[in-house]
Amino acid sequence: INPSKAGAQMPECIKNPDPNEYIPIVENSRCLARWDAAPEMPGALQFGKYCAEKGILPSIAHTAAEYKDVKAAFEAGFTHVTHFYNAMPGFHNKGEYKYEGTVESVYLMDDMTVEVVADGIHVPPTIMRMCYKIKGVERMALITDALAVAAAGDDAQAFDPRVIIEAGVCKLA
């Protein structure tokens, strides 16, 4: 994943895809269904192509990808986006001009599916409605972002010291 979009991922655990590491994992596992990567990172397109060839869904996540990156990823086999809208940019400026971010680029890939955290906090209902209008029910999944402390109450202790729980919502401090 892209370290600049780590979100709740522990920065010290982030690294670029390395075939010397992921190939043995894939070859010795029978349960991998999906694996996330940021397509703009070194080795990510090769990783996505390998996963797709092995029947594992490569998914875009924690990314700063722009259109050229998303298009290259789609062509390499990435056909899904994890936690759409979260840990990825939308429109942004370079100087005085607007540029598409990951979000708009994904909307331009008609056959790319997305998953949206449907808690009304990660993504507001109005944006979920917009996503539904653009992607449709066939290409949009509603998911949770539940952690190990889900439904445990505000006094629960999270596994990561950066995580706090307030009013039933788990978030980074």
What positions do the PLM features span?
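Histidine/acidic-residue-rich, glycine-tolerant segments that coordinate divalent metal ions
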Residues: I1-Y99, A151
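Active-site-adjacent C-terminal substructures of enzyme catalytic domains
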Residues: D69-A173
